[in-house]
Amino acid sequence: MVEEYSTEEEFLKKYDYKSFERPSVTVDIAVFGVLGEEVDSYRKDEKKSISLLLVKRGEHPFKGKWALPGGFLTENDESVEKCAEREVFSETNVKPRSLFPIGTFSAKGRDPRGWIISNAFVSVVSEDGVNAKGGDDAAEARWFKGNFTAVEDSEGKTKKLYRLSMTSGDTTLCALFEKIGCHFGRDEFFHEKAAK
């Protein structure tokens, strides 16, 4: 039987928030950098390239692995947006000019530390003059240039497989994606497996 309360104040005095499972809340930020390179032509055009800012984790779990900058919401953060700004700057020394929410990931079992709800953001910054460096629990921060190419079979025919390569110095991160369809003019991809 549900107990009835005459006022909200009475209800809140007896309310026990500990009786509900509480996940941790985090943010993850995909920071894209746009870099302009002058092209040698009479027009002095600029060739633009795009990179993704990644951090090498300095602590467990996944110590030594490359990841998006991010971290846990604390009591000092006013919002997940403020948390995202704080985490990007503390881990990379890069100040995002704007943050756009792109999704929330809440499935249990995604993180070995427990049930974590992650709020994902994207930010685009000019890479010119930005010195990314690791800080806080990030051992290192680097810009990785992206390349998305179709995978050809032995006969030179393009399959529905695509390779995403992210490169910084002597480090290359790769993944294979399969094109699974086109709906309403938009291609859909499925992450196949890590590529070597």
Regions found by a protein language model. Give the residues of each.
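N-terminal leader/linker segments that precede catalytic domains of diphosphate-processing enzymes
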Residues: M1-K196
